[in-house]
Each structure stands twice: as C-alpha cells, then as structure tokens.
C-alpha cells in the first residue's frame, strides 16, 4: 500500500532540506609565476596577498611575499628554487610565516623554518609563533639590573653585561668573536639560562665544530642552534635571526632567561642587500637598501628585560659584526653600534701579540651593564679601566724615555701584571668568585714581586689552593656578592699564605 504524503508534509521536508543544504566551496586565490631569478620570483594575479604572507608553489616549495607592486608581487623562495618555472601556479596560504618554539628545540640544530637538520629525528613542539613580532613597549620593560656572567674576566670586570642588554661583539675576522660567544654559552651551565646561537652564512664545517665544542662541554643541552649556512639561500639567511629571537621570546614570555648570539649580522645585511637588489629596490650607501637600519633595529629591540607584572623574563642579545681592517666607521658597524647598549671591540694587533681575549679596553664600553655588576667585582675593578688606560699611555711613553722614575716604573710593572691577569684561554670560563680573587690580588699589589711571565701559573695554582684551604672565602664572595671586611682580611691572609709556597 502506497504511503500518501500530505502537501504540508512535503513542504516541511523540502524546507528542512533547504535549511540543511551546504555548499562546501574552496575558494583560493591563485597566481602565476611570470619571472624567476636568483631565488626571487615575480608572481601575477595575487591581488589580495599580504606583505610577509607565505605562498605555495605547484611543486610544494614555499615562498615569502616581500614586494607588493601594482600588478605583480615579489616572492622570495624559502629553500631551493630548483623546479620552479614560469607559468607555474602559486597559491595563497592566508598565513604569515611561523616557526616552532619550546623546550623541545633545546639540544637541536634547526633551519630558520624550525626543521631539524642534525639527523636526530623530528622535534616535538606544540606551539608555533610568528617570526615577525612587535618589540615590547616602554611600560612592558624594566631597567637592566641582574648580571649575566660571561666567565670572561675582561668582560665581567670592565664591560659588564646585564640580563636584557644588547652588547655588540665587533672585530676583524679571526679575532676570537665566536670564541667569546661559545665561552659565554659554556658559562651559563647551571644558571637556568637558555642559549640560542644563530649561525648566518657560515661554512657548515665551522658550525659543526661549534656544535661539537658545545657538546664536549655539556652545553648543548640548554642551547638551540639556528643555522642558515653559506650554501643556503639569501632568504633563509635573512630569516635566521628573526626565527632565533622568536624562539627566545617563548622563554622570555614564560618568565625565563635567554641569551641569543647572532653570528654574524654583517652577513645578514649582505643577504638582505642581495634580496633587495634583485627585487629592484633602490640602493643607498654601500648599495644597501634604505631600510637596512630598521632591519637590525627591529631585531635587536626584541631583546628586553620584562617588568615583574609580565613575569620578569629576559632576552640578552650579543650581535656580532665583522669589520674590514678595523673600520668601525663603515655603514653596518655604525648602525649596530648606535642600536646596541655597548660594544666589545676585538683587535687584530692585540690578538697577534698574545693578548687573548683581544679586547681593546679603551674602545669597549657597556652603557647599562654597570647597574647589573655585582658589588664584589665593582670593589676590585673600580679603577682597573683607568689603570689600564694610563698603563697603555705610559707604555707608549716608555719606548722613547731611557730613564724612568720609580713611580712610573712601578705603574708599568703593575699594568703589565694586570694585562696578564685578564688573559684567558678559550673555552675555560672563570666563575665570578675566582675572578674576584685574582683581580683582587693584582689590584692590591700581591703580584708586583711575581714575574709577569709567571702570573698565569700563579693564577692556575692559586685557585686549587683556595678551593682546598679557603673554600669559605670563595663561598662568601659567591653568596654575599660583596667583599666584607672579614672576607677582605681572609682573602689577604689566603694570598699571603699561598705566596710562601709559590715557586714562580
């Protein structure tokens, strides 16, 4: 028997069907590649694309939109441009570039997109962040007041760095810039500080040697290495520092402390210049584009010490700049000097004369780190900078003067010994309490009767002696962070006690 449907039933069924009817339409804006040269493609037809948006090519390659022109857009290819041809389709993603962040990245070597390149398998990270983020404003920040110990005597005593500071490391090639960075990373062991080392445009063998050195000292466990090598495209080299600081911001925003090294921003500027010239942007001084200052300022402003309300986390930045024949007045060096809170200037002549780290104390400065220096170091190194400056002056004068009075001679002798005190081998950072002890010995004349050539031996033997017999003095300096009258007396007694047994 056939079922009879009433007219109102039919209309209600049709109405229900109409209400539940959905058209699943996937609307994509698709453009076409009209030109490609040196990793930069010109794409036609993406009328609504955003600056900084990620686009996808037919062959799966990804690109980043940098130029928005009237008819076309300039897209840099992220990775290799092999396989991209004219006429190929390009699809919008609607998303800006992101990179993975989090604890899962520690101990790994990644490219600027967050993909692992160390052969240790995939990285488990739950969070992604935009590579370009706005720097914290004035009210979100707090003044730099906590010390960041580098373990390098000359820096901690004369050019102190605080958490949240930007301190430039500048010098010619082969003057020990990367060594300073590695030393500082090694010295953060046990300090609950995450280190990020960004290698830009370096040889893969150099980066491999750095990774090996960090592994040997057990420092890779709390370090992330972001590598855009010399063989990688200019686009990846350009993105590397921004990816690195995005990873650091995750720790800063969670109330933790991070240190980031950009090695080096000279190559970063060169990569940006290469991209800009191919994108036909007008060149300026030294053929760099007009916004090369903003390139570095927006990067370095993201290093900050956050206020207590925002968790009091910090990012300390150490940008590295390579100069040509000591020319600090070139375009990129002067730009970065003006952005940072001080600079550590390394000199070839000092390096070649055996003074290592080859820090020029006269030209190096820390504009905000003094507020972060612990009192014990301030007490022993108060006049050290002036003493070394007058020593250099006297040294130049003594070359021409045959007979010197006793005071001048004693100043020269003291200066020579202080220069020896500040010398240090690579990859052996010195804890702050031991720095205080040896600088105290030099500043108070305990090394005046020790031959300058024996100062290093004196220090090497003094430290085990202090640990064995006067550990309480080292503990007092470490815990109180100052030299009390009692500690001062104990320290003098310890050094005098050691000198009786020292055979220089």
Swiss-Prot record:
One annotated Gene Ontology cellular component of this protein: plasma membrane
The catalytic activity, as recorded, is: ATP + H2O + 4 H(+)(in) = ADP + phosphate + 5 H(+)(out)
Q: Which residues form the signal peptide?
A: none
Q: Which domain of life is it from?
A: Bacteria
Q: What class of enzyme is it?
A: translocase
What CDD domains does its record include? ATP-synt_F1_alpha_C (cd18113), ATP-synt_F1_alpha_N (cd18116), F1-ATPase_alpha_CD (cd01132)
Site: Required for activity. Where?
364
Q: Please report the record's description of how this protein sits within the membrane.
A: Peripheral membrane protein
Q: Does the keyword Translocase apply?
A: yes
Spell out the molecular function terms from Gene Ontology. Answer: ADP binding; ATP binding; proton-transporting ATP synthase activity, rotational mechanism
* Enzyme Commission identifier(s): 7.1.2.2
Residues bound to ATP? 171-178
> Gene3D superfamilies, from UniProt?
2.40.30.20, ATP synthase alpha/beta chain, C-terminal domain, P-loop containing nucleotide triphosphate hydrolases
Complexes and interactors: F-type ATPases have 2 components, CF(1) - the catalytic core - and CF(0) - the membrane proton channel. CF(1) has five subunits: alpha(3), beta(3), gamma(1), delta(1), epsilon(1). CF(0) has three main subunits: a(1), b(2) and c(9-12). The alpha and beta chains form an alternating ring which encloses part of the gamma chain. CF(1) is attached to CF(0) by a central stalk formed by the gamma and epsilon chains, while a peripheral stalk is formed by the delta and b chains.
Q: What does this protein do?
A: Produces ATP from ADP in the presence of a proton gradient across the membrane. The alpha chain is a regulatory subunit.
The protein's matches in PANTHER family, at most eight in alphabetical order, are given as:
ATP SYNTHASE SUBUNIT ALPHA, MITOCHONDRIAL (PTHR48082:SF2)
Its protein name is ATP synthase subunit alpha
